[in-house]
Amino acid sequence: MARKRQDVRPIVKLKSTAGTGFTYVTRKNRRNDPDRIVLKKYDPIIRRHTEFREER
């Protein structure tokens, strides 16, 4: 079954704001979160929790 072009749950990259270049890959619901996501997650390079922002 083919996916729709404008998927309701697209795959997005979350990049660390600490400047380490570490990324997480996740899905988001466009209807609930139309803006860019900002989450606090663990960055193993600096061994701390930092903000991760959605990349486009």
Swiss-Prot record:
A biological process from GO: translation
Record keyword Ribosomal protein present: yes
Alphabetized GO MF terms: structural constituent of ribosome
GO cellular component, one term: cytosolic large ribosomal subunit
The entry's keywords: Ribonucleoprotein, Ribosomal protein
Family: Belongs to the bacterial ribosomal protein bL33 family.
PANTHER family: 54S RIBOSOMAL PROTEIN L39, MITOCHONDRIAL, LARGE RIBOSOMAL SUBUNIT PROTEIN BL33M
HAMAP family (alphabetical): Ribosomal_bL33
Annotated protein name in UniProt: Large ribosomal subunit protein bL33
Encoding gene (name): rpmG
